[in-house]
Amino acid sequence: ADDYDDEVLPDARGHRPIDRKREELPSLRPAPPPISGGGYR
């Protein structure tokens, strides 16, 4: 059940196969702020 788990629905489970490439530089641009407050500006 672990063989096809990663190749059947990688993005469906939220493994972010394409995101892992862009997440290489998460510190480069703080565009997506983890704070939902929006008042820390």
Swiss-Prot record:
Residue ranges, annotated region (Disordered): 1-41
Biological process annotations from GO: adaptive immune response; blood coagulation; innate immune response; response to calcium ion
Biased composition (Basic and acidic residues): 10-26
Modified residues (Sulfotyrosine): 4
Positions of the record's site feature: Cleavage: 13-14
Segments for region (Beta-chain polymerization, binding distal domain of another fibrin): 14-16
Recorded GO MF terms: protein-folding chaperone binding
UniProt note: domains: A long coiled coil structure formed by 3 polypeptide chains connects the central nodule to the C-terminal domains (distal nodules). The long C-terminal ends of the alpha chains fold back, contributing a fourth strand to the coiled coil structure.
Role, per record: Cleaved by the protease thrombin to yield monomers which, together with fibrinogen alpha (FGA) and fibrinogen gamma (FGG), polymerize to form an insoluble fibrin matrix. Fibrin has a major function in hemostasis as one of the primary components of blood clots. In addition, functions during the early stages of wound repair to stabilize the lesion and guide cell migration during re-epithelialization. Was originally thought to be essential for platelet aggregation, based on in vitro studies using anticoagulated blood.
UniProt-recorded name of the protein: Fibrinogen beta chain
Gene: FGB
